[in-house]
Amino acid sequence: MIPHPPQVRIAPGFRPVLAVLCLLGVSSALTAEDAPDPAAILNAARMNQSRQSAELTGQLRTAADKAPFRLTVDNGKITYQFQDPDQGIVLVLGTKDSELFERMGGRKSDITPARYDRPVRQSGITYEDLAMKFLYWPNPKLLGSDSVRTRAAWKLEMQAPRATSQYGVARVWVDKQSGALLRVEGFDDSGRLRRRFEVVSAQKVDGEWILKQMRVETFDPSTRKVVSRDYLEIDGATVAAPSPAP
């Protein structure tokens, strides 16, 4: 008989709102007495994001410019609203996959894989990063325990399905207490680091922990040197209680 993997338990209480890769992660505490099943860790993160509501304002800051935005999270739909030019980028988190589309000039259109490697607002973030496809890649591996800025985390690795991504492998660090994504790294097909997203600081708003600053670093795979360093910063938020589980 094959034993069942340890269950991931989602407990009430500490519910941080963390925008990671503009990956906005809203999660309840994720704990397990033993190392949990990696697929359960990712599933818990996806499910919790789809149950939260929040309104955030901030900016995407590059070396050359700042792009203010409003970020709305509502029951599985995450909307990034930019101005000058007006652009809405909408992420819908499903149970088996995510969808990404754009609203410009009153028109809605799908953001197809052909655009996934293009930068968002001339930053180091690409449309694929916003789509969060790596959270759905099959057969994740648990590499063990680690820490990110003193926070205990599970470290996982996912292999991209063939010819579907600019990345070959993604590694993620998931906070053991909150279930939030603390760091994400994307590697090319040769195992060379291309991009790193890391939560630098958090802040408390209306009794909830939310992102204050996330750093986005883009690397030259051949030299391993940083070629750009951008920041996603949150300066205000209203966080609503999560929707009840179905």
Model-assigned labels for residue ranges:
Residues 1-12:
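N-terminal secretory signal peptides that target proteins for export/translocation
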Residues 54-58, 69, 78-80, 168-170, ...:
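One face of beta-strands
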